[in-house]
């Protein structure tokens, strides 16, 4: 019977602690209901949990971006070929540009 009295005493103190935490959370601007649910489950309140989920999504998104970057690299590869074509055009432009010395042959 002594055990029963101890259990009821711990329950009262646990309730008091929960109430104190709820009051502190209200004063600090935290959502009291979320804290209460976590405390009832015996789990500590963790706000970073949502952030971790976002980080996982970001990591997956980064992987997708890497695939997109690979496509960009292929586009750049095609761009370098065009760059070589542009070099040839510059040579042709040089041929079209006549030196003023050559024009004064008259």
From Swiss-Prot:
The modification Phosphoserine is found at residue 8. It is found in: Nucleus. One of its GO terms (cellular component) is nucleus. Uniformly expressed in all embryonic cells at 4 and 8 hpf. At the 20-somite stage (18 hpf), ubiquitously expressed in the developing nervous system, in the tail bud and in the pronephric ducts. Also expressed in some placodes, including the anterior lateral line placode, otic vesicle and olfactory placode. At 27 hpf, strong expression persists in the central nervous system and the olfactory placode. Expressed strongly in the eyes and the pectoral fin buds. In the tail region, expressed in the spinal cord, in the posterior lateral line precursors, and persists in the pronephric ducts. Residues 1-106 are annotated as: Disordered. One of its GO terms (molecular function) is histone binding. Keywords: Nucleus, Phosphoprotein. Residues 40-76, 85-98 have a biased composition (Acidic residues). InterPro entries: Pro/parathymosin (IPR004931). Disulfide bonds: none annotated. Residues 1-39 have a biased composition (Basic and acidic residues). The modification Phosphothreonine is found at residue 10. GO terms for biological process: apoptotic process; negative regulation of apoptotic process; positive regulation of transcription by RNA polymerase II. Belongs to the pro/parathymosin family. PANTHER family: PROTHYMOSIN ALPHA, PROTHYMOSIN ALPHA-B. This is Prothymosin alpha-B.
